A protein has these predicted regions:
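Conserved, mostly hydrophobic/aromatic
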Residues: 39, 113, 153, 172, ...
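Substrate-binding cleft and catalytic face of glycoside hydrolase catalytic domains
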Residues: 62-251
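Aromatic/acidic polysaccharide-binding cleft in carbohydrate-active enzymes
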Residues: 283-381
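Alpha-helical scaffolding within the catalytic cores
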Residues: 22-27, 50-55, 103-108, 155-160, ...
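Hydrophobic h-region of N-terminal signal peptides that target proteins for export
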Residues: 8-18
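Glycoside hydrolase catalytic-domain groove-lining segments
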Residues: 243-296, 328
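Carbohydrate-binding surface patches
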Residues: 375-412, 417-422, 448-456, 460-461
Length: 461
């Protein structure tokens, strides 16, 4: 009797899942898996002395395609990294004199990034300031001097200036979140006008001397009016603009996806159909931003939320869902950070494990994508691929805790990994069942996890 009831239950779940469209047909191909697993910054330099604490091998293993710099100095306390004011600390000095630059820490950081196998996007700007007063983020009044400093930084890394390198760093962005006074402080409140003039002053000499580079901005905090006005400024003055990015800290993958579509549409309307669209910073968002800085009691709970299973499955869902979007680049903020990062001690937390799972799906961009749907209204996101004679399926149960049944066509499952509150992308042997006749795979959900993600490895028929 119990056996009959169990089979009926499986049949019911299967019928429901097929009605939901949880079918993976490995014969249906859709190009390649796009490597949208970019990140902000790289393995921390301030704990690299000892092999046991060095994050570099983990970052290398994650196969990150591109790492863009923002808040690198904050991620590495005590190190003068990346920011303009840390490379060229005394603004009144001669910008043509190599002795006035401090390149060595940033040199090591850039080389460290490249050692992971990742490209670099170098942000010419400053780290955010949460202090009462503003110091490094005050808008310079001499834009030409600022541009002179920036072109020398580019020359150092791409043309060997000042005992530098020829690294061919392609991507150069200007500033970050210029619509916020915490990162671009304009005493007159004219952030848009100031940023536009700053951007133009910096990128014109870069593109003139290094035409193969890509330049872009504004990396705003979701202010479409600011973004559109900036793009219109570039159009009206014929200012180079190769990519446009913004920041997003939603708790819903569809909100992020809609913002990407809106930005693509805006660029096409304004006159930049070839400009790339990207998200400069993204992460499962906090429920209250002020709690992180002003409420120690709530900050601990907020940090746990940002590193927990809902956040991890959100990350996996974003990487899956944005395959069907105009996004060219996504950058997760920020794996090496303590609050926002990939790590629980020396081990990967759910966010880091989501990126590890995606790495297995993508195979450095060589994996063929299988055409599967997602069901955001039900909190279910699917991604499937095949490479090396194997098939892979990633199923995300975002904020739902029920079982799932997949119908697989052209493949037989051989192992199932699960990410949940307890299981850290580990193989589960007793929580799945394969019925070869109809080709159904039952995936048992964990008992006490608000979200879960499965990674299924298959042999292709």
């Amino acid at each position: 009797m119990k056996s009959t009831l169990a089979l009926l239950a499986i049949a019911y779940v299967a019928a429901t899942s097929f009605a939901d469209g949880l079918v993976v047909d490995f014969a249906k191909e859709k190009g390649k898996i796009r490597r949208l697993n970019g990140i902000c910054n790289t393995a921390r330099i301030n704990n690299s002395m000892h092999a046991k604490s060095d994050q570099l091998p983990i970052f290398k293993d994650l196969e990150i395609p591109c790492s863009r710099y923002h808040d690198a100095a904050l991620n590495n306390p005590g190190y003068a990294l990346v920011d303009i004011s840390r490379i060229f600390p005394l603004f009144h000095l001669d910008a043509d004199d190599p002795r006035n630059y401090i390149f060595k820490p940033t040199d090591d950081y850039v080389l460290r990034t490249l050692a992971t196998g990742s490209e670099v996007e170098f942000k010419l700007g400053e780290s955010i300031e949460h202090s009462k007063n503003r110091y490094r983020v005050v808008a310079p009044t001499d834009m030409k001097k600022l541009a002179d400093i920036c072109i020398h930084i580019v020359r150092h890394y791409n043309a060997g200036w000042a005992n530098g390198y020829k690294l061919n760093i392609r991507r150069w962005s200007v500033w970050e979140e210029p619509n916020l006074e915490q990162i671009l402080y304009c005493p007159d409140g004219k952030n848009l006008e100031t940023y536009c003039r700053m951007y133009e002053a910096i990128v014109r000499p870069i593109k003139a001397e290094f035409p193969e580079t890509l330049v872009g901005g504004p990396e705003d905090t979701g202010d479409m009016n600011f973004r559109r006005a900036f793009v219109q400024y570039c159009r009206d003055r014929s200012v180079p603009l190769d990519f446009v990015m913004f920041d997003n800290y939603s708790r819903d993958p569809e909100v992020l996806r809609n913002c990407i579509f809106e930005t693509r549409k805006m660029l096409d309307e304004v006159g930049f159909p070839k400009a790339r669209v990207g998200v400069a910073e993204w992460h499962y968002g906090p429920t209250g931003w002020q709690d992180l800085n002003n409420n120690p009691a709530k900050a601990k709970a907020t940090t746990a939320d940002l590193q927990g299973i809902d956040s991890g499955v959100y990350s996996a869902s974003v990487l899956a869902r944005m395959q069907d979007s105009p996004a060219d680049d996504l950058f997760f903020y920020v794996p090496s950070g303590k609050t926002w990062g990939f790590f629980d001690g020396s081990q990967l937390n759910p966010n880091g494990l989501a990126f590890k799972a995606f790495k297995m799906m993508a195979a450095k961009g060589e994996a063929t994508r299988v055409d599967v749907p997602s069901f955001p209204e039900r909190g279910r996101y699917l991604l499937a691929s095949k490479h090396g004679g194997k098939g892979w399926v990633m199923l995300c149960n975002f904020k739902r805790s029920d079982d799932a049944v997949l119908r697989l066509k052209g493949a037989t499952p051989v192992s199932v990994l699960r990410l949940d509150d307890v299981c850290r992308l580990e193989e589960v042997r007793d929580d799945w069942r394969w019925d070869a006749a109809p080709g159904t795979l039952l995936l048992k959900a964990p008992l006490a996890s608000t979200s879960a993600m499965w990674l299924v490895e298959c042999n292709l028929d």
